[in-house]
Amino acid sequence: MAGSGSWDGSQSDNSSQFEPGIDNIYEAFICPLTKQVMHNPVTLENGQTFEREAIEKWFQECRENGQPLSCPITSKELSITDLSPSIALRNTIEEWRARNDALKLDIARQSLYLGNAETNILLALKNVREICRNIRKIRQRVCNPQLVRLITDMLKSSSHEVRCKALQTLQVVVEGDEESKAIVAEGDTVRTIVKFLSQEPSKGREAAVSVLFELSKSEALCEKIGSIHGAIILLVGLTSSKSENVSTVEKADKTLTNLERSEENVRQMAINGRLQPLLAKLLEGSPETKVSMAFYLGVLALNNDVKVIVAQTVGSSLIDLMRTRDMSQREAALGALNNISSFEGSAKLLINTGILPPLIKDLFYVGPNQLPIRLKEVSATILANIVNIGYDFDKVPVGPHHQTLVSEEIVENLLQLTSNTGPEIQGKLLAVLVGLTSCPNSVINVVSAIRNSAAIISLVQFVEIHENDDLRLASIKLLHNISPHMSEELANALRSTVGQLGSLVSIISENTPTITEEQAAAAGLLAELPERDLVLTMRLLREGAFEKIISKIVGIRQGEIRGIRFERTFLEGLVSILARITFALTKETDATLFCCEKNLPSLFLDLLQSNSQDNIQRASATALENLSLESKNLTKIPELPPPTYCVSIFSCLSKPPVVLGICKIHQGICSVRESFCLVEGQAVDKLVDLLDHENDKVVGPALAALSTLLEDGLDVVQGVRLIDEADGITPILNVLLENRTENLRIRAVWMVERILRIEEIAREVGEEQNVTAALVDAFQNADFRTRQIAEKALRHIDKIPNFSGIFTNIG
């Protein structure tokens, strides 16, 4: 008898002689070279028998060593090296092996129950694996339903080792055996195996993946595996794991590849981040498969990076589907394109791939095979997504005659389509126009088309829509975008209709949990309307708009109204709207009374200190200028008592009566609330601080507000003294010297001339050559009136003699 040995990594057949109930191995069955039971015995000319593979290897080694071919047993040289198959011996061995396998399987069946000792179970599982491997070698198979079910029962063991070996055994049993796979697929066994992907140690996970890989080779089982909750996400997770061994990762990947035969599995993979199979089917599948995949791509949640990948991979194919005459293909393609067009990166790729021409054609085409309205709405949505990325659309042709998206003809068609469709598509078309008007390069084209088509009235009417929030929002955003270019037309439209102005006010004043985009857009729209439009201002006053706006401003300033995203733009709009009432003070008593009642000067003084909010500071300074200009009309001049007889006789010797509380500037009794006095409101310091602002649009209004203290009819000397006390002289001179804009220079020259009327200031400033140079430049190059004022300023510092005036003096 030959001893036991190792063969092919598993326990050899000769070990069976030590197991109870197993036939002993006959010595004739053993190959002298391998010491293993032979599978393909062959005989030499001298009658010695060997395993074919082993003796062929022996002969090869003899040749490589330059030795004559000899018998490994007798060491004698062979004259003939032909190998004769030992058919009878092979049949005998196979019969012996089949008999022993049957006995081993019977013992295994008896050992495979959960109450048995772990060692017995493990031995039984090992024997089953050996038998199955041997059967594979002789290209036979065995299907023992009872045994397969007993092995699956071992998956319920409390022992990790038993469960792992049971999985390894199942993998060997089902390999290439469809019947065994079908038995494993019964009941919840596959679900249990899937569970092991996350709950077992590393070896157990590898064994579970190996079983699933074998099962997934059966097309009939692909859907069953994929239908188990968590199966695909766990497999996808394993493929990207950095901690799993390479074998587990590779088997998981191969399993998923097999599962791709089911479209539902492909969808599940896409949901869980493995999108490539879906894209591959969309590119290479049948027309029906392409439609199915495109439909699913349209509803799939995608992050922005994935949208770019999708656009790169299948963007062209989707556009081709969109161009077909098949309505289901077009619908599926539009849905997918809608999904991936909402990110700037993917939208640019789609533009470069040529999406715009067919998209525009689908929107405007009327005739056979035209898109139904519901799909035109999707087309409009895609177009809205694309135009909101801020692309140079004037360089992308979309029509047969090289029209672009911002060509007047195309924009007018969009406007016409907006008027002739339902609310859903109207909202999308308006969103397209919002995108186009958000770009400085294209807004002028849209404004021109709106003017030429007289569409402003119909656009304003959308403001009153209450049944469709998206439509109303899009219309307000569009009107806001065009308002800087069409403020007069918008004001006329709002004046000539009933309800729209009130609707905008209602939106602004609505009590919402946070500030909405619609509120910010509505406020921005009203803020752009002509500020000197008295009719519009008084309508706002009568409708209670200003009171509501004050409430909103105070609420935001006190932190009672929040909305980080839109708070700044909303507040800017509110302050600008409120400031317009100060333009009505000279003509409307009601406006003056409202400003007094609500103490608007104090509110604007508070807003003046809104650091880093230029538009709010600009509007507040402008409002304070208007309020201050009205102070001289509101100041109460005290009545002096009539002089006594003696005083009237000796008036040259008497002193004028002293009245306490007289304003130095307005020579009357002032207050910030009732007469809008900047001095009483302690506004001078705050306005002077803004003169150093980097934004010219803030400096100008601040300078204008300060200049109201130097107006004719006021005590200019006292006004200059107040500005000097606030250290405002130098900043004013700096505005003159910097010469940022012509308007700032005109205002600065006017103020400097008044300041230089103070003799000691004139002496000091006269020594500053740069100031003199700036005044000389204004004297030579500014407009006529400013040149006159600059001449007077130069006289104050003795740079022009009094007898050398060349202009008519002005008061």
Curated annotation (Swiss-Prot):
Record protein name field: U-box domain-containing protein 43
Placement of ARM repeats on the sequence: 136-175, 178-217, 220-261, 263-302, 303-342, 344-388, 399-438, 444-484, 489-528
Annotated pathway: Protein modification; protein ubiquitination
InterPro entries referenced in this protein's UniProt entry, alphabetically: ARM-like, ARM-type_fold, Armadillo, RING-Ubox_PUB, U-box_domain_protein, Ubox_domain, Znf_RING/FYVE/PHD
EC number: 2.3.2.27
Domain U-box intervals: 24-103
Keyword Transferase found: yes
Keyword tags: Repeat, Transferase, Ubl conjugation pathway
GO biological process: protein ubiquitination
Pfam family membership, one: U-box
Function statement: Functions as an E3 ubiquitin ligase.
Residue ranges of the TM segments: none
GO molecular function, one term: ubiquitin-protein transferase activity
Enzyme class: transferase
Gene this chain is encoded by: PUB43
Originating species: Arabidopsis thaliana
Family matches, as PANTHER family: RING-TYPE E3 UBIQUITIN TRANSFERASE, U-BOX DOMAIN-CONTAINING PROTEIN 43
UniProt entry tagged with the keyword Transferase: yes
Catalytic reaction annotation: S-ubiquitinyl-[E2 ubiquitin-conjugating enzyme]-L-cysteine + [acceptor protein]-L-lysine = [E2 ubiquitin-conjugating enzyme]-L-cysteine + N(6)-ubiquitinyl-[acceptor protein]-L-lysine
GO cellular component: mitochondrion; plasma membrane
